[in-house]
Design a protein with these regions (language model features):
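Conserved alpha/beta-domain cores
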Residues: 1-134, 142
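Glycine-rich phosphate-binding active-site loops on the catalytic face of alpha/beta enzymes
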Residues: 30-34, 132, 136-163
Length: 163
């Protein structure tokens, strides 16, 4: 129990069964369908899995996530309240991968404002995850409560070259 596995990558519904028995938190819930599947698989293991809704705040189409409107619909959906084996405890967003700090700061601030609005009605939302190794200082200044800094800790990823 000393290690807490956080799932931070894109998660397909058909892969949830492989992590539901041990994952501590899932950071990348980007649909109601995925949330329902996490609930179903967590129930099989008699667990409650904390989740973050992933919001699409970047200007890059390669990133996944919900719009603010879609996230609000899920947070306020009575069906979600009935899901007994998942808990939405916050929001996660990744900013555009750019050197333009003003643009990145704007994306983080807009997510923080949305988080604050949602939290007024849903005080159980306590985690705002934004910021990675390259932009975590901007994220913290905007109000992030959780950062992902694996590259800073472990070094940049190296991929084997194709031969």
């Amino acid at each position: 129990d000393a290690v807490r596995w956080h799932f931070i990558g894109h998660l397909q519904s058909n892969k949830v069964k492989y992590i539901a028995g041990f994952v501590h938190m899932i950071h990348t819930v980007d649909s109601l369908k995925l949330l329902q599947e996490i609930n179903k698989q967590a129930a099989k293991h008699q667990r409650i899995i904390p989740c973050l809704l992933q919001l699409h705040i970047a200007r890059e189409e390669t990133k996944y996530g919900l719009s603010f409107e879609e996230a609000a619909e899920i947070i306020n959906d009575p069906k979600v309240v009935g899901l007994k084996n998942v808990r939405i405890i916050g929001l996660m967003g990744m900013a555009t991968n750019t050197e333009n700090e003003i643009a990145v700061q704007h994306e983080f601030v807009s997510l923080k404002h949305f988080f604050d609005r949602m939290r007024e009605q849903h005080p159980e939302l306590t985690v705002l995850s934004m910021g990675m190794s390259g932009d975590y200082k901007l994220a913290l200044s905007a109000g992030s409560t959780m950062v992902r800094i694996g590259s800073t800790i472990f070094g940049e990823r190296t991929y084997p070259s194709a031969t």
